[in-house]
Amino acid sequence: MQLIKNNFSRYVIAIIACLTSACSPIKVLNSLVPENGYELVSAVEYGANARQKLDIYLPKATEKSTALKKVIIFYYGGNWDSGERADYKFAAEALVGHGYIVVIPDYRVYPEVLFPGFMADPVSVAKWVKTNIKKYNGDANGVFLAGHSAGAHIAVMMAINPEYLAEASLKPNDFAGVIGLAGPYDFLPLKSDRLKVIFGSDAEQWKSQPINFVDGKNPPLLLAVGMKDGTVWPRNSINLAKKIKDNNGLVEVAEFANYGHIDMVTKLAKPLRGDGELLKAITLFINSH
């Protein structure tokens, strides 16, 4: 009972502090997330650009172990035009608590880059992790690509269209698996003028759709979808999964009946986790590959 009271008091104090200083909702959420379960290696450069930095969340060792840890690279969403790695501390905390190393990078977005240019930085991150993660006791053969929304599009595109990873002398099956949360994979025709600028002419837009590159040779794929998502329609995940299955590829679908678009990432946060069904689906997938 005392623990519950202490946690409640901490949440109330954090909310009041953020409200009185005009914090963003994401900062409020992150202020409620525990920080004592991991070590943070911040602002590691993987390139020369100001946005080519990544954070590494390492599980705190409870006992000496030489076993290498599985690694998750998490690409955040933001409509391909925004996002900050520090905002996703809550997601890292959820995953690092299960013993995984979590890498969250920034990457260049619109208007600095357009499609397919915005794929370059995520590929560079994947290469950096494969090359360097053993220094942090990470398993280079146990690296998972993951993302939410636009970040899921990027992660899944790397898994399905091998031309992107080939630029870094990598192949999709160099990765243990891929996790897409509420991702857009089959979203033509484009209606937004901004997206038409990002993804180019009508004749070229087909190249931006992961579903168009399915050949069944992808690494194991988990597509998690909120069935109340009104931002990225659930059909994106359902259609992609069907095509992968039709090509004898490896794919699992986790449907969440009452989740909307934002729920598909914020439900990882400890204060909003509820029964933890989203986190359970992710950890079950990772632990089985």
Description of each model-found segment:
Residues 113-134:
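Alpha/beta-hydrolase active-site loop
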Residues 67-78:
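Short beta-strand element of the alpha/beta-hydrolase
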Residues 26-65:
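N-terminal cap/lid segment of alpha/beta-hydrolase-fold proteins
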Residues 86-104:
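Short amphipathic alpha-helix adjacent to the substrate-entry channel of hydrolases
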Residues 33, 183-213, 219:
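Mobile cap/lid helix-loop segments that gate and shape the active-site cleft of serine hydrolases
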Residues 223-225, 229:
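Short beta-strand/loop motif that positions the catalytic acidic residue
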Residues 247-289:
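C-terminal catalytic histidine-bearing segment of alpha/beta-hydrolase fold enzymes
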Residues 127-193, 206:
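Primarily recognizes the serine-hydrolase "nucleophile elbow" in alpha/beta-hydrolase
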